[in-house]
From Swiss-Prot:
Changing A181I: In allele SERPINB11a; requires 2 nucleotide substitutions. Residues 341-365 are annotated as: RCL. Belongs to the serpin family. Ov-serpin subfamily. Keywords: Cytoplasm, Protease inhibitor, Serine protease inhibitor. SMART domains: SERPIN. SUPFAM superfamilies: Serpins (SSF56574). Changing S303P: In allele SERPINB11a, allele SERPINB11b, allele SERPINB11c and allele SERPINB11d. This is Serpin B11. The record marks K357, S358 as: Reactive bond.
């Protein structure tokens, strides 16, 4: 994996583990890529301790050159170090239009009209993240501004992410709101037939079941059996193989905790590596499900180590604006996912631990109990979405 995709996986799993520990027994769903883009745009203008905290949490500090000092006065975006230009390339690869798959990532900065932003910051964020600044009046038109931002997000996510900022969540004293929206709708390479979908039990925990709409098909898919912790790993590609859903299904409910405990960038890469997965005929049972989640990220990011950014006194965003006291007052992440027969609508140990030999002719993959899933960009190995289905 390249340095950027490694950082993407590490950050994704850090966020997952933090959300998982704070939402025990709940469904989890978020876009790690969306968060990474948004925080990288902040990093572009961060300096000092704020910059160091962000680089560490995003796992950039050991993978690429950090931002060079003097960026705010420099005439070229190339002065800002390699990470953002790498992002620019990745962004264009992932954001390519495709008639069979809708994937749109949209970034925008909302700044108070009284705030001066460095022109260099604005031009570089537009070049690499296609993020434009829109000036608004937080102080005098707070409610109107909130509606403006929500309407933009709703439009960019095809109406799936509505009311991102609820009433009273934007303060009149706000000076900057950074918004990142991501929307995905993909068709399966091998669609499930609606006539094959049946009502079936889904085991939530020992002795507790719910009835779900269980989709079914027999097809040729990449599958791996992991011995420790015991699980099946299935890859369901979307049309054109640009993206795929990776499902980590524990053998029995008890193994889920072990998978979560051992999950890191190394084990994820090992478990989901194409060299460890064998193409074979598989009977797939997968529940139809929809997830809609909303997370306040302030406390989550603070617990990961980004503390100064949310502190008006300590935050150093001098690469973004010469104005003192600029900080991020609120970070909210809302996601939507719909998995159906057609496809998905949404807004990765030693070689011995993976068994790829002596498999039965046809394998069964029965997702009738909680599992983890990831939507991944095949070419770059970038994780776009990450989740846990605890209860459909």
């Amino acid at each position: 994996m390249g340095s950027l995709s490694t950082a993407n996986v590490e950050f994704c799993l850090d966020v997952f583990k933090e959300l998982n520990s704070n939402n025990i027994g709940d469904n989890i769903f978020f876009s790690s890529l969306s968060l990474l883009y948004a925080l990288s745009m902040v990093l572009l203008g961060a300096r000092g301790e704020t910059e160091e905290q962000l680089e560490k949490v995003l796992h950039f500090s050991h993978t690429v050159d950090s931002l060079k000092p003097g960026f705010k006065d420099s005439p070229k975006c190339s002065q800002a170090g390699r990470i953002h230009s790498e992002f620019g390339v990745e962004f264009s690869q992932i954001n390519q239009p495709d008639s069979n798959c809708t994937l749109s990532i949209a970034n925008r900065l909302y700044g108070t009209k009284t705030m001066a932003f460095h022109q260099q910051y604005l031009s570089c964020s537009e070049k690499w993240y296609q993020a434009r600044l829109q000036t608004v009046d937080f102080e005098q038109s707070t409610e109107e501004t909130r509606k403006t931002i929500n309407a933009w997000v709703e439009n960019k996510t095809n109406g799936k992410v509505a009311n991102l900022f609820g009433k009273s969540t934007i303060d009149p004293s706000s000076v900057m709101v950074l918004v990142n929206a991501i929307y995905f709708k993909g068709q399966w390479q091998n669609k499930f037939q609606v006539r094959e979908t049946v009502k079936s039990p889904f085991q939530l925990s020992e002795g507790k079941n719910v009835t779900v709409e269980m989709m079914y098909q027999i097809g040729t898919f990449k599958l791996a059996f992991v011995k420790e912790p015991q699980m099946q790993v299935l890859e369901l590609p979307y049309v054109n193989n640009k993206l795929s859903m990776i499902i980590l299904l524990p053998v029995g409910i008890a193994n889920l905790k072990q998978i979560e405990k051992q999950l890191n960038s190394g084990t994820f890469h090992e478990w989901t590596s194409s060299s460890n997965m064998m193409e074979r005929e598989v009977e797939v049972h997968l529940p139809r499900f929809k997830l809609e989640t909303k997370y306040e990220l302030n406390s989550l990011l603070k617990s990961l180590g980004v503390t100064d950014l949310f502190n008006q006194v300590k935050a150093d965003l001098s690469g973004m604006s010469p104005t003192k006291g600029l900080y991020l007052s609120k970070a909210i992440h809302k996601s939507y996912l719909d998995v159906s027969e057609e496809g998905t609508e949404a807004a990765a140990a030693t070689g011995d631990s993976i068994a790829v030999k002596s498999l039965p002719m046809r394998a069964q993959f029965k997702a009738n109990h909680p599992f983890l899933f990831f939507i991944r960009h095949t070419h770059t190995n970038t994780i776009l979405f990450c989740g846990k289905l605890a209860s459909p």
